[in-house]
């Protein structure tokens, strides 16, 4: 049964969701399928990973971003993933990559066979989406039309100006604790799949849309990663929306008319158009 997502009046397209499980080996990931009431003929399929700090986050907290992706004109499968510290790196990444492969094989269940496939995520989910793009390249996996990263957690050092300058207070500890829970030991931070911003080889990745905000404490690592992708020859679009955005905390809230998440919908729609098969 389809349930309405956030109130229709706040969106150009009504968006609905239903439960959608993905069977991966012996495991079943209980996710959600988001779809516009009127699905565009050219709709792509987005595998979305919710936010949090690797040790937190749920499908419900990812609803606003998943809805925004669907409102931009895509079918979205939003997936949970194993949380740290019980499941340290690379367990969440391997689980989501297996799900990505399964979804790619079964893509015709939801969209046309030639429809583009994307990965997307916010915060820790943005980290996983960026790493999935690397894995798909390295393992000759599902061909991706693009990666959409909202304020991704990419740098475990937490030393950027935007992070240090943010009035984070105790929030700063939450990010450090999340990284510690995910990595387990410092040497794992050197792995490119764990901290994509430090990867030595970025060429050959799917086109990227990276969205951050002026007052986002993850702004600088988002911009740094976009710059490194561009230098490696990856077709990359970086969008810095105006503040106050209250990103990334606001990702878990219902977007309101004129909010930064609603304005990001236009950037996503443009990215879908630019990366659609010709």
PLM feature spans:
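Alpha/beta-hydrolase superfamily serine-hydrolase fold, recognizing
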Residues: 5-278
């Amino acid at each position: 049964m389809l349930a309405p997502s956030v109130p229709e009046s706040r969106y150009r397209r009504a968006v609905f969701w239903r439960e959608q499980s993905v069977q991966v080996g012996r495991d079943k990931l209980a996710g959600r399928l988001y779809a516009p009431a009127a699905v565009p003929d050219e709709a792509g399929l987005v595998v979305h990973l919710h936010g949090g700090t690797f040790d937190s986050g749920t499908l419900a907290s990812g609803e606003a971003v998943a809805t925004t992706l669907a409102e931009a004109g895509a079918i979205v499968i939003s997936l949970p993933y194993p949380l740290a510290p019980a499941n340290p790196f690379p367990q969440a990444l391997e689980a989501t990559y297996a799900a990505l492969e399964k979804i790619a094989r079964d893509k015709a269940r939801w969209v046309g066979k030639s429809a583009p496939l994307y990965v997307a995520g916010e915060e820790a989910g943005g980290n996983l989406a960026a790493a999935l793009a690397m894995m798909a390249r390295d393992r000759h996996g599902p061909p991706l039309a693009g990666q959409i990263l909202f304020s991704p957690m990419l740098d475990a050092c937490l030393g950027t100006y935007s992070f240090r300058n943010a009035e984070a207070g105790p929030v700063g500890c939450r990010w450090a604790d999340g990284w510690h829970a995910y990595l387990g030991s410092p040497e794992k931070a050197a792995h490119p799949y764990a901290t994509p911003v430090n990867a030595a080889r970025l060429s050959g990745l799917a086109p990227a849309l990276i969205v951050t905000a002026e007052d986002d404490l993850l702004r600088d690592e988002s911009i740094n990663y976009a710059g490194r992708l561009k230098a490696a020859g990856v077709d990359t679009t970086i969008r810095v929306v105006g503040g106050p955005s209250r990103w990334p905390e606001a990702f878990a809230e219902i977007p309101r008319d004129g909010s930064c998440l609603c304005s990001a919908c236009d950037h996503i729609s443009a990215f879908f158009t630019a990366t659609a098969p010709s």
